[in-house]
Swiss-Prot record:
Belongs to the histone H2A family. This is Histone H2A-like 3. The keyword DNA-binding applies. Its main location: nucleus. It comes from Homo sapiens (Human). It comes from the Eukaryota. GO terms for biological process: heterochromatin formation.
Length: 148
């Protein structure tokens, strides 16, 4: 029995859900988001994989059309205007812009108290100071704190 040693196989490297499905989109992240949203009581193991595949297909399709739009306009960098123009030209993808318009119309601003409005005004003033003063921001903030 002394000659019988346990044979250990080398462990295979773990593969992520995305890699197993040969997708670029993060399947595990989508699964976590779906579980946290609690829209459904039970979630199939293939649901996030399918959703990642659909999102990847849509993204690739949109980027292909946007790339053609950028090439036609003789530019090197993709801007939001290029994306919007490409979506407007494609009849099948135009619904994405309609979704965007619906979400903007449904969003309403929350009523704010006077304190929250003052805090927001201070933040806006600080942003102006940041833009104007550039690298001297820290010194300026310290002086204000000492004075008050």
């Amino acid at each position: 029995m002394a000659g019988n040693k346990m044979f250990c196989r080398p462990r295979r490297q773990r593969l992520s859900h995305s890699r197993r499905a040969e997708l670029q989109f993060p399947v595990s992240h989508l699964e976590r988001c779906l579980r946290e949203s609690q829209h459904a009581r039970h979630l199939s193991s293939t649901t996030p994989v399918f959703l990642a595949g659909v999102l990847e297909y849509l993204t690739a399709n949109i980027l292909e059309k946007v790339g053609k739009e950028v090439k036609n306009s003789c530019r090197l960098c993709i801007t939001p205007e290029h994306v919007k123009r490409a979506l407007q030209k494609d009849e099948q993808l135009r619904w994405i812009l309609e979704l965007e318009d619906d979400t903007h119309s449904q969003v309403e601003e929350m009523p704010q108290s006077e304190e929250e409005e003052e805090e927001e005004e201070e933040k806006e003033e600080e942003m102006v100071v940041l833009v104007v003063m550039g690298g001297r921001r820290r010194r300026r903030r310290r002086r204000r704190r000492k004075d008050s």
